[in-house]
UniProtKB/Swiss-Prot annotation:
CDD domains: ABC_6TM_MsbA_like. GO terms for molecular function: ABC-type oligopeptide transporter activity; ATP binding; ATP hydrolysis activity; ATPase-coupled lipid transmembrane transporter activity. Residues 27-308 form the ABC transmembrane type-1 domain. The chain crosses the membrane at residues 23-43, 64-84, 140-160, 163-183, 247-267, 273-293. It comes from Pseudoalteromonas atlantica (strain T6c / ATCC BAA-1087). This is ATP-dependent lipid A-core flippase. Its EC number is 7.5.2.6. One of its GO terms (cellular component) is plasma membrane.
Amino acid sequence: MTHTLPTQNVFKRFAVYLKDFKLAFGVAIIGMVGYSLIDAYVISLLQPIIDGNGGKWDYDYLRIAAYFVIPVFIARGIFNFMGTYTLSWISSQVVMKMREQLFHQYMHLPVEFHDHHPSGQLISKVIYDTEQVAGAAGKAFLTLVREGALVFGLLFWMFYHSWQLSLVFILIGPLVAMIVSVVSKRFRLVSKNIQQAMGNLTSSAEQIIKGHKVVLMFGGQDLEASRFAKKNNNNRQQNMKLVIAQILSVSSIQVIASVALAVVLYISSKPNFITDLTPGTFVTVVVAMTMLLKPLKQLTTVNSEFQKGMAACVSIFSVLDNAIEKDTGSKVLDKAKGKLEFRDVTFHYPNKEEAALSDMSFTVEPGKTFALVGRSGSGKSTISSLLTRFYDAQQGTILLDDVPLQDFKLKDLRRQFALVSQHVTLFNDTIANNIAYGSEGRVTPEQVLAAAKTAHALEFIEQLPNGMETLIGENGLMLSGGQRQRLAIARAVLLDAPVLILDEATSALDTESERLIQDALETLQQDRTSIVVAHRLSTIESADQILVIERGRILEQGDHASLLSEDGAYAQLHKLQFGDGQTDA
């Protein structure tokens, strides 16, 4: 995901986000320029006040100024509000749009992408990187226009009053430009490192929060604290590098500006060199030059904000540029019959040499139960991932109702499968909404209740204080493993898909929970094609066909009785689980 785009190209792409806010930008620019020009104009009033009427105080001028100063500063405040509020509004809109784009992209990127990128870093892009973009769109642009307008306004009055003295200040321009160019590259590099460090920090915190029970059980507090401290210190160091670069650049430019000011003062001390300067003109020019130091400092500082924003844009664009899931199918499918077929399927996971599946071929007739048995890592779960097209096979063809999976629209294809896994995913929402997930707007509360009853979930739901409206916490942390599993089954019941995938659905459950869930699964499997991935052979004895897999290849295939009679790999697995005396079960 590494991009090395030039700043100009990144800014052009970023500018696309701003094109919808042309009117707002116009208002903001008017506000910021008006604010700065008032400041510059106030400085220009020093000359007539000091020089007065032939060197005497002009009391009429002072009286007019007294009436004039309040409206001027009211106008200054209005201009400031126009510029600051409008730019803040624009930056918030840009951040919102970028976050929505990232979120949408995350949902449509292939599973392979999420396999290779820590969730903490992806979250950091949504939360932290977009805020850096806001800094570029808001604070940086505000400072650039407002302080830039002030610089031009002050230079205008300086040249108007004494172009000879003002010319000295212009000579520092190339030096300032050179410093800004060098420092910009440093800002960009350090900003990129800060974003990477922030992503690592977020990942570390997320891991500990999710796995805090494991940390407590194994006494890993000191280890994790040390790891986090190291990453936290790295983040601090990167931020300090940015601060150092910022301080050095600001100080360098201010020193150069002070040299120019010193030259002006020295020239002014030579009466024969400049003879037409009045005291008021001299004071106005010197004060304007002194006031230039602050906007020059701000313009140098804003460079760091801008470079942080551009580095964040590169980070965000690197995600947005990833290809989303390929959905090349055109066939619409309402409800499949449920026939599945693998024809000479070979599949490699990315960056792995050994095939997860090799020349895999089998057929599952509609309404039949097909069980997959084998050691961990043999390729059982890979089959279910290929059926739902989380991955695509490199060789061979997978068919649903005699049609290759790639020919169907992805959304229609996945609607044909209901997955119940040992790794249940629930959301921080009500029980009813979790059961109805994916079916919202298409089901009634009565149907949700019926699904819960079929899954034997009502037994515990009715005991909760708010029943179906009970909030269950992140990933159902308020529920037991068996309760979470039953909600997953209820979700599958409500989906009413023609093909059911059960991936270790009853593993690691107590006997009572397993009995209830097994009853619910038997009801769910009726009139559906079922793919059952199991370690517990007792759960698949009634399967129509059992496939024994080893290292991605089919070792044996048949029903429970025939495989036992062959006394092969399946029979050996059965003996390990039940003992020699129960091989006829």
